From Swiss-Prot:
Keywords: Activator, ATP-binding, Cytoplasm, Kinase, Nucleotide-binding, Nucleus, Phosphoprotein, Serine/threonine-protein kinase, Transcription, Transcription regulation, Transferase. A motif (TXY) lies at residues 171-173. It catalyses: L-seryl-[protein] + ATP = O-phospho-L-seryl-[protein] + ADP + H(+); L-threonyl-[protein] + ATP = O-phospho-L-threonyl-[protein] + ADP + H(+). This is Mitogen-activated protein kinase hog1. It comes from Aspergillus glaucus. The gene is hog1. The active site is at 141 (proton acceptor).
Length: 366
């Protein structure tokens, strides 16, 4: 049975197994607190994320289950890797991943990026997206703060909590809005993997220019800024808008011509601008795919078709439309944790799952 140790960080109780020491806070988000720590078992630095109140509502329970199941399924060099997960006696969930020194947001606010770094970072983002998309997963919340980087410039995508969910009206954060594809922002239609290509294009533009490409104050202003650069959406794209209010708004905007990106990115290589043009296209069906982008001339120094793998199997989304009570999500989550630790879900283990609280939970700790 694992021994748990408590510490108070930012006024929050952090309750982890004694395997992890030297806790240092590195980030706080709407859904959790992240601390750097030392793994006593391996000696490696790790990131420990406390998912706060995962069972407080069915929506949060489902979100936590989705992120956990995704991290278990996805295994790729450019995707954050889950190394441990456990439930504390206070019934909080803690996930442990490798620790990378910084993220792209911090990097972009500290200094301009040189060409070779921009190329290498974009290559790794697209390499990760090719794998994720082949698994039938849409990240949907790609932004610089969800792109982790270490001192060797190795890059890993994180933040899969919102992956492939219909817009829950909780995504008005400024940092997220800047990278949002127009088809999500204005809920035009069902969306697919192309939304991540748009986000990657916005991130690419920010790496080239040193500042966000579309810094809208709200969704209306955001869309207006997009049309100032990319012009009015084509008629066949406008016709896909289902909402009458959205359709009225789009048609009320003044007609604008697409501006050549070469005038906006005067110091960028022509190959870089060409790739960006192919990523920032209003019509999702005409946006370049991740695999195609990897083969673009701009990324030739890094492109290796023999080392850009796809997922071996699709992710199982059968749970995603389920409307279940908290207790059911809790049992499903416990089952996933037992599976992660290769614990036989015998009759005894099942009894522990049903109990769900108290000392029995410590059996799930690594």
């Amino acid at each position: 049975m694992a021994e748990f140790v408590r510490a108070t960080i930012f006024g929050t109780t952090f309750e982890i197994t004694s395997r992890y020491t030297e806790l240092q806070p590195v980030g706080m988000g709407a859904f959790g607190l992240v601390c750097a720590a030392r793994d006593q078992l391996t000696g490696a630095p790790v990131a420990v994320k406390k998912i706060m109140k995962p069972f407080s509502t069915p929506v949060l329970s489902k979100r936590t289950y989705r992120e956990l199941k995704l991290l278990k399924h996805l295994g790729h060099e450019n995707i954050i890797c889950l190394s441990d997960i456990f439930i504390s006696p206070l019934e909080d969930i803690y996930s442990v991943t490798e620790l990378l020194g910084t993220d792209l947001h911090r990097l972009l606010t500290s200094r301009p990026l040189e060409k070779q770094f921009i190329q290498y970072f974009l290559y790794q983002i697209l390499r990760g997206l090719k794998y994720v998309h082949s698994a039938g997963v849409v990240h949907r919340d790609l932004k610089p703060s969800n792109i982790l980087i270490n001192e060797n410039c190795d890059l890993k995508i994180c933040g899969f909590g919102l992956a492939r969910v219909q817009d829950p009206q909780m995504t008005g954060y400024v940092s997220t809005r800047y990278y949002r594809a127009p088809e999500i922002m204005l809920t035009w239609q069902k969306y697919d993997v192309e939304v991540d290509i748009w986000s990657a294009g916005c991130i690419f533009a920010e790496m080239l220019d040193g500042k966000p490409l579309f810094p809208g104050k709200d969704h209306v202003n955001q869309f207006s800024i997009i049309t100032e650069l990319l012009g009015t959406p084509p008629d066949d794209v406008i016709e896909t808008i289902c909402s009458e209010n959205t359709l009225r708004f789009v048609k009320s905007l003044p007609k604008r011509e697409r501006q050549p990106l070469t005038s906006r990115f005067k110091n960028a290589d022509p190959e870089a601008v060409d790739l960006l043009e192919r990523m920032l296209v209003f019509d999702p069906k005409k946006r370049i795919r991740a695999g195609e982008a990897l083969a673009h001339e701009y990324l030739a120094p890094y492109h290796d078709p023999t080392d850009e793998p796809e997922a071996q199997e699709k992710f199982d989304w059968s749970f995603n439309d389920a409307d279940l009570p908290v207790d059911t999500w809790r049992i499903m989550m416990y089952s996933e944790i037992l599976d992660f630790h290769n614990i036989d879900q015998s009759e005894d283990a099942g009894q522990v799952l049903v109990e769900g609280v108290g000392d029995g939970q410590q059996a799930f700790a690594a």
